[in-house]
């Protein structure tokens, strides 16, 4: 499939052939598994000391004393110990470090999931169904010249995004930033932020600095491209801007 390459003014300058990876069948099941595997591998195993609450010298005084037959502190028989309902006792069902919390996925399945997520960025219906505003976007996938990689000023990237028709989607991401409900707002996750366009480049020559302050915009090189960036929240079809060099590098890696 041939697509147009746009300059930074939003004008088509040439046509190129897309790599075969954009013809990969749509596999939402594998994409979901790959994203969840990526999520779970960021979780740190936690557990409790196996001897917590058990470091007491206790005795069982037996029956006939008018007291519950639970373990008692040897030097203070009035106070229970060891049992979960006692002060300083063990926990009932503490978390264990042995618990398997990581979801794994085979290497070939993960590679196929990335390829399928890449192909989903070229599906207009999937991009629109994900919530992106693409009314003014000239084409999906949007391919631009390599000069985009050298833009390092936020004001310049803003004008480029407007000329390429993706600024409406960035405004949508800005308006959908909300304060998180619950205690997560106290733990470094105060805001729930919507995802806007993804910029994939062959080489970072300043574009990361120029685009990082725009709400919802992510910049990544082809080598670091992952399924979580292509399908945030397990939902494929993210609006993606590719540079011409990124398309060529994609052809070398995935064919």
Curated annotation (Swiss-Prot):
Q: Which HAMAP family does its entry note? A: Ribosomal_uL4_A
Q: Give yes or no: UniProt keyword Signal.
A: no
Q: What is the protein's given name?
A: Large ribosomal subunit protein uL4
An example Pfam family from this entry, by short name, is: Ribosomal_L4
Give the multimer and partner information: Part of the 50S ribosomal subunit.
Any GO BP: translation
What keywords are annotated for this sequence in UniProt? Ribonucleoprotein, Ribosomal protein, RNA-binding, rRNA-binding
What organism does the UniProt record list as the source? Answer: Thermococcus onnurineus (strain NA1)
* Record's function text: One of the primary rRNA binding proteins, this protein initially binds near the 5'-end of the 23S rRNA. It is important during the early stages of 50S assembly. It makes multiple contacts with different domains of the 23S rRNA in the assembled 50S subunit and ribosome.
What does the sequence similarity comment in the record state about its family? Belongs to the universal ribosomal protein uL4 family.
Among the GO molecular function terms of this UniProt record, one is: structural constituent of ribosome
On the tree of life, the source organism's domain of life is Archaea
GO cellular component entries: ribonucleoprotein complex; ribosome
